[in-house]
Amino acid sequence: MAKTSMKAREAKRAQLVAKYAEKRLALKAIISSPATSEEDRWDAVLKLQALPRDSSAARQRNRCNQTGRPHGFLRKFGLSRIKLREATMRGEVPGLRKASW
C-alpha cells in the first residue's frame, strides 16, 4: 500500500493540472504559432516556465484506486494488476474471467 503522503501528492498534482490547464494551453498555442513574433514567443516561454512545475500533466502518475500502487496500473479499470486479479476472481468485474483454453 502506498504511503498516504504519496497519494496526497498525486491529488495535489491533479488539482494543479486542472487549475492551470487553460493557461498552459494558451501559452503553448502562442509559442507554437508561426505568426507570433519572437518577442511575444519569448515572453510566453518565460511565463510558461514561471508556472508551478507540478502543473504539467506529464508529472502525474497513474495509481491504483484501492492501494495507490504506481506500477502495473491498468487504465481501463483504474486498478493495479494485483487488485484487478483479486476482483476478477471474486467475480466483481463484469465480462472478465480467468482465461481457459
From Swiss-Prot:
InterPro entries, alphabetized: Ribosomal_uS14, Ribosomal_uS14_bac/plastid, Ribosomal_uS14_CS
Query: Which top-level group of life is the source organism from?
Result: Bacteria
Asked if the keyword rRNA-binding belongs to this entry, the reply reads yes
Keywords assigned by UniProt? Ribonucleoprotein, Ribosomal protein, RNA-binding, rRNA-binding
Gene Ontology molecular function, alphabetical: rRNA binding; structural constituent of ribosome
Gene Ontology cellular-component terms for this entry are: cytoplasm; small ribosomal subunit
One GO BP annotation of this record: translation
What Pfam families does the database record attribute to this sequence? Ribosomal_S14
Which HAMAP family does the annotation name? Ribosomal_uS14_1
Q: Tell me the NCBIfam families matching this sequence.
A: PRK08881.1
What does the function comment of this entry state?
Binds 16S rRNA, required for the assembly of 30S particles and may also be responsible for determining the conformation of the 16S rRNA at the A site.
Question: How does this polypeptide assemble, per the annotation?
Answer: Part of the 30S ribosomal subunit. Contacts proteins S3 and S10.
* Family to which this protein belongs: Belongs to the universal ribosomal protein uS14 family.
Please identify the protein, giving its name as recorded. Small ribosomal subunit protein uS14
Which species is this record about?
Shewanella frigidimarina (strain NCIMB 400)
Lineage from the top down?
A: Bacteria, Pseudomonadati, Pseudomonadota, Gammaproteobacteria, Alteromonadales
Q: Which gene encodes it?
A: rpsN
